[in-house]
Every structure is written in structure tokens, then in C-alpha cells.
UniProtKB/Swiss-Prot annotation:
This is Large ribosomal subunit protein bL28. The gene is rpmB. GO terms for molecular function: structural constituent of ribosome. Gene3D superfamilies: Ribosomal protein L28/L24. One of its GO terms (biological process) is translation. Keywords: Ribonucleoprotein, Ribosomal protein. Transmembrane segments: none annotated. GO terms for cellular component: cytosolic large ribosomal subunit. It comes from the Bacteria. The initiator methionine may be removed. Belongs to the bacterial ribosomal protein bL28 family. NCBIfam families: L28 (TIGR00009).
Amino acid sequence: MSRRCELTAKGAQVGHKVSHSNIKTKRRFLPNLVNVTFLSDTLGRAVRLRVSTNALKSVDHRGGLDAYLLKAREAELSPKAVELKRAIAKKMAGEPVAAAS
């Protein structure tokens, strides 16, 4: 399992640990990933994803998983998230739009 967010594509970065005597040694900065179960309103089911806490905050800010995925670019999503995005878009396109009366 890679250490990469399935929604934002955040991954590990490489940097230096710097000692008091300014000796630099390589280290990895890992993203803060959590396993989360999202509820898709459109699909009507639960979806488990491994996302960063920053992405979790972004999903909440945009109004849920469906809204986040529809607005996100496919290039930065994981294959699982792209499949979800397409399923949500297909389901939303198939539903008739309720006319305001």
C-alpha cells in the first residue's frame, strides 16, 4: 500500500534532518493519511478511501464526497477515485432534473 492520498495525490517527500552541528542526513516526510469511510449520496453506498487529513477537510468544505469528486481533476485522483467519479457523473446524468414550479 503506497503512502499516497487517493484524492489529492499527496505523497512522501524527501528532505534533510539537520543536527545541531549542521550535519544533514536524508529523511522522509510522510503525509498524514487516515482510512475513512465516506457516504456517497448519489450512489447511496459507503466508500472506503485512504486520504490525507487535508483532503478530509477539503471534502467537508466542498459539501461531501460527490461534490469533491465532480470538481476534482482526474489526473490527481487514484484509479479507484476516478471510477467513483465516473459512476457518480453517470448516475447524476441519468436522473431527470426536477422542474421548479
